[in-house]
Amino acid sequence: MMFLPTDYCCRLSDQEYMELVFENGQILAKGQRSNVSLHNQRTKSIMDLYEAEYNEDFMKSIIHGGGGAITNLGDTQVVPQSHVAAAHETNMLESNKHVDDSETLKASSSKRMMVDYHNRKKIKFIPPDEQSVVADRSFKLGFDTSSVGFTEDSEGSMYLSSSLDDESDDARPQVPARTRKALVKRKRNAEAYNSPERNQRNDINKKMRTLQNLLPNSHKDDNESMLDEAINYMTNLQLQVQMMTMGNRFVTPSMMMPLGPNYSQMGLAMGVGMQMGEQQFLPAHVLGAGLPGINDSADMLRFLNHPGLMPMQNSAPFIPTENCSPQSVPPSCAAFPNQIPNPNSLSNLDGATLHKKSRKTNR
């Protein structure tokens, strides 16, 4: 049986007694008189009893507030308190006979209120266990270390943190101390792993700068374009070397002129039967047969016009004379054919000198 607090108990006179009954899920208080039959039995809910007690106190305050009497305009008449209470109880009995749905709702709500009140009494304080205390302590320690002002980064240096960082708009969540140590350790491992890769990238950049300095007229910034230009330049150099070796095969030793590149060019042109006044190169179909990557005259012309190649100088046309053969021409005669003396001019000079000598002897 659930006992009600004394605050909710109504005040009964000496001729009445009250009985608590649990009916239809509700706690009801039945007040009965000893000299009243069962037909006059009163059944009230807790809310009704509370309202009755409140109304009774209110009426008492009105009665006793004016000196214990109610004054009328005509004559003064004192109303005993027992008569007022009896009249009020009569009205309550008549009103309880017409119980509607609203009173039932009030009773159910009062029941829930009482049950909640007793449940709050039964709630016991359970102290936290050791694991929760340790977790809470570590979490608070992380907050305390982060708000001290000094924070250790991955390099081992210390920097002063300001309170403005915590009060910024995008406030970052605080990381506990254990998690921060794990992150710092992981970052150091990543830096140690990336140091060989960084050194390798630095070496590659140095070599690419050296290659850019070797290439003529190279102003490329990206590595891919610079490598393409280096490949083209090396291919043209290889073709030039192959052309020079093929040219030396076609020239015979008897037709080679000593002392100077102009003689080898002249001998090369003479050995293949070309004229001296024309361009002193082998035909495209002859050179292209021994050079890879050159299949037609257009490729040959593009190769000869490459800016990285040294152009071959054209020598002056060679005019053979009667007394000067290719095998017995001195170097001065071959290098400067315009300075070769003419036989007619030599005979005229000899005659002039002989005439002068004869005049001197005659004197």
Curated annotation (Swiss-Prot):
Q: Which GO terms describe its biological process?
A: red or far-red light signaling pathway; response to abscisic acid; response to salt
Amino acid composition bias (Basic residues), ranges on this chain = 178-188, 354-363
- InterPro entries the UniProt entry points to: bHLH_dom (IPR011598), HLH_DNA-bd_sf (IPR036638), PIF1-like_bHLH (IPR047265), PIF3-like (IPR044273)
bHLH domain residues? 188-237
Q: In which tissues is it expressed?
A: Mainly expressed in fruits and flowers and, to a lower extent, in leaves, stems, seedlings and roots.
Looking up PROSITE patterns in the UniProt record yields: BHLH (PS50888)
Keyword Cell inner membrane tagged: no
Note the subunit structure.
Answer: Homodimer. Interacts with APRR1/TOC1. Binds to RGL2 and RGA. Associates to PTAC12/HMR/PAP5 which acts as a transcriptional coactivator.
What's the protein here called?
Transcription factor PIF6
Lineage of origin = Eukaryota, Viridiplantae, Streptophyta, Embryophyta, Tracheophyta
Which gene does this sequence derive from? Answer: PIF6
